[in-house]
Regions:
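Feature captures hydrophobic
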Residues: 1-125
Length: 125
């Protein structure tokens, strides 16, 4: 069991994405970066997508990414537990989004897969 929003957790997510044919097919030809940050714990992780390959690693909060989602650990926990979906969390202000709205809408179905994979990892909070 991984501690949520830890390096161990994100390495497990990275492995699951790497072994997920749906994700690999959906991200063929895609080059993007997504930063996921907790505002109250000061942790940030960078998801790097490059033509079907995905890497996730700890990063500095100042690092720029094409898309960024930030919120409290509690907000991320609600997402992990399925109490709220990513879109609702952003629309309700639980998570703050930065990046191109038009482009994220184009990638929406692909990126929702990351949230689904995150929910599939056995967690401790």
């Amino acid at each position: 069991m991984s501690k949520y929003f830890s390096e161990e957790f994100f390495k497990e997510v990275e492995g699951k994405l790497g072994g997920d044919p749906t994700w690999q097919q959906a991200t063929k030809g895609v080059k993007s970066t997504i930063k996921l940050s907790t505002t109250d714990q000061g942790t940030s992780y960078l998801v790097t997508i490059d033509d079907g390959t995905t890497r996730i690693g700890k990063t500095d909060a100042a690092v720029q990414a094409e898309f960024s989602f930030e919120g409290t650990y509690e907000a991320w926990t609600k997402l992990a537990k399925g109490e709220v979906d990513l879109q609702s969390a952003v629309l309700k202000g639980h998570l703050r989004f930065r990046g191109s709205i038009t482009k994220i809408l184009f990638y929406k179905d692909r990126f929702v897969r990351i949230a689904d994979i995150m929910k599939s990892v056995p967690l401790e909070f």
